[in-house]
Amino acid sequence: MQEIIIQVMNQFGYFGVAFLIMIENIFPPIPSEVILTFGGFMTTYSELGIIGMIIAATIGSVLGALILYFVGRLLSVERLERLVSGRLGKVLRLKPEDITKAEKWFLKRGYATIFFCRFIPLIRSLISVPAGSAKMKLPSFLILTTLGTLIWNIVLVSLGAALGDNWEMIAGILDSYSSVVVAILGVIFILGLLLFVKKRFFPKNKNYSPDSEK
């Protein structure tokens, strides 16, 4: 994977960077850390510049985020509510009100979420889908996405340029960081799933009292 990424970047320059970063947003397993840090290193031996590299990466990030945003718009809250109001909702123990609550939560805290999640592996890409489903205003989404990805790109491209031949060291550190974050997210997901199952399938009987068994 890394060799293919480097070949594309060497051959297509800025366009290759923008394309790869766009695909990385849609297909998170592609390592953006390698693209950005190697992109920074490329500026030390080619005609490509740091500013151009950052701009290309940011354009690619925003385009990829927009694709997922509109995927979220297709999978709207209204459609989700219709889905859970039928048999699927009974199986999952979900109600239309649950979808509405989730939408309200996202609209209340979604602006900060969109910005800060741009620094978290995996979530960085996927957060665009609920933003679209909740119908977050497109200008706000674009501004927050651009700011978050711009900061991320500036840091990694600059580190790659500063370290030169040692750019892979940063990519390795960030890969370890990504693995830890994904593991933590996995644990949180499992705990959340267990809590959801407990509440839905094993609800507490509020009317229960010791005297009721006598």
Curated annotation (Swiss-Prot):
Primary subcellular site in the record, as a coarse category: membrane
Subcellular location: Cell membrane
Annotated Gene Ontology cellular component terms: plasma membrane
Keyword Cell membrane assigned: yes
Listed InterPro entries: DedA_domain (IPR051311), VTT_dom (IPR032816)
Topology of the protein relative to the lipid bilayer: Multi-pass membrane protein
Keywords: Cell membrane, Membrane, Transmembrane, Transmembrane helix
Pfam families cross-referenced by the UniProt entry: VTT_dom
Transmembrane annotation, as ranges: 3-23, 48-68, 141-161, 177-197
Family membership: Belongs to the DedA family.
Protein name as catalogued: Alkaline phosphatase-like protein
UniProt source species: Lactococcus lactis subsp. cremoris (strain MG1363)
Lineage, top ranks: Bacteria, Bacillati, Bacillota, Bacilli, Lactobacillales
Gene that this polypeptide is encoded by: apl
